[in-house]
């Protein structure tokens, strides 16, 4: 990955962001939830590099703690949705027939609706909160993974080593998890990396629309919506979390593109 400078730089950036999120309690000297009305809407200074919000909370501290929320929401729902999509894609591609038809038609229905709209419906039904965000994003994002894995499985099922395993009487589960799934991993790695930004943006959008993270959670999307009325008087309150979202999303996208370029020769050879 060092040969792709942009992807390597993005990887370093992601590692630094993760370290900041993990050690936020050590790095930050302020509590992200402690209010101080006498310090509200302070301009950037040495004590508060990005100023303070309308409740006197340090903006930089809330952005660092907000990285925990964004990365967690980027990783956990993506892992869950990819697990669901991978299992369904493997089953549909390997067995075919009516099973394939039912799973893929259900996936088509899910893909026919905007994922953000479906997530909003789920959130309105279950209510706000981080756990419900995990559930909503996991339920609406599995379909694209299932289609990709199904396509890979259809191709791999025709390989000689798979046909040989079938002729030797190896059971289907062993063939799927020993011969088919391992060869899908390079594609899944790239797909996973490129899916994380989508989940982060979805969480930010849901929070911005008022159905995602709830106050006083230090969420980047929630910080943007809380500070939008100060856009012209205290623009850093809006720009800081917006730029944080942009940096993380771009870093994961560039890393995903780099991994795709690295793994592309392997995928073509396979």
What are these regions (language model features)?
Residues 24-32, 93-97, 122-128, 140, ...:
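Short helix-capping/hinge motifs at transmembrane helix termini and TM-loop junctions
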Residues 1-86, 90-91, 97-98, 112, ...:
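Gly/Trp-centered helix-boundary motif
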Residues 123-125, 137, 152-153, 201-244, ...:
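Glycine-rich helix-loop "coupling/hinge" segments at transmembrane-helix boundaries
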Residues 49, 53, 59, 83-85, ...:
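Generic hydrophobic transmembrane alpha-helix motif, especially the helices
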Residues 17-18, 82, 108, 124, ...:
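Residue-level recognition of pore/gate-forming positions within transmembrane alpha-helices
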């Amino acid at each position: 990955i060092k040969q792709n400078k942009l992807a390597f730089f993005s990887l370093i950036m992601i590692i630094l962001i993760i370290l900041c999120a993990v050690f936020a309690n050590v790095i930050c000297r302020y509590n992200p939830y402690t209010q101080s009305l006498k310090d509200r809407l302070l301009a950037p200074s040495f004590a508060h590099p990005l100023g303070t919000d309308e409740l006197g909370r340090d903006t930089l501290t809330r952005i660092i703690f907000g990285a925990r929320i964004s990365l967690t929401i980027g990783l956990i729902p993506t892992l869950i949705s990819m697990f669901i999509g991978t299992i369904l894609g493997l089953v549909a591609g390997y067995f075919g027939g009516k099973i394939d038809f039912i799973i893929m038609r259900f996936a088509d229905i899910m893909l026919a609706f905007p994922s953000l709209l479906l997530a909003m419906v789920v959130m309105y039904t279950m209510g706000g909160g981080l756990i419900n965000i995990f559930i909503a994003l996991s339920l609406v994002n599995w379909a694209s993974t299932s289609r990709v894995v199904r396509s890979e499985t259809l191709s791999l099922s025709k390989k000689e080593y798979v046909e040989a395993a079938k002729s030797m009487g190896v059971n289907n589960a062993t063939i799927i998890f020993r011969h088919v799934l391992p060869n899908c991993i390079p594609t899944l790695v790239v797909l996973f990396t490129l899916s994380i930004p989508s989940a982060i943006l979805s969480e930010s959008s849901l929070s911005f629309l008022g159905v995602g993270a709830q106050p006083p959670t230090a969420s980047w999307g929630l910080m943007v919506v809380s500070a939008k009325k100060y856009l012209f008087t205290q623009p850093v309150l809006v720009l800081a979390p917006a730029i944080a979202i942009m940096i993380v999303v771009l870093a994961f996208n560039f890393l995903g593109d780099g991994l795709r370029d690295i793994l592309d020769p392997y995928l073509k050879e396979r």
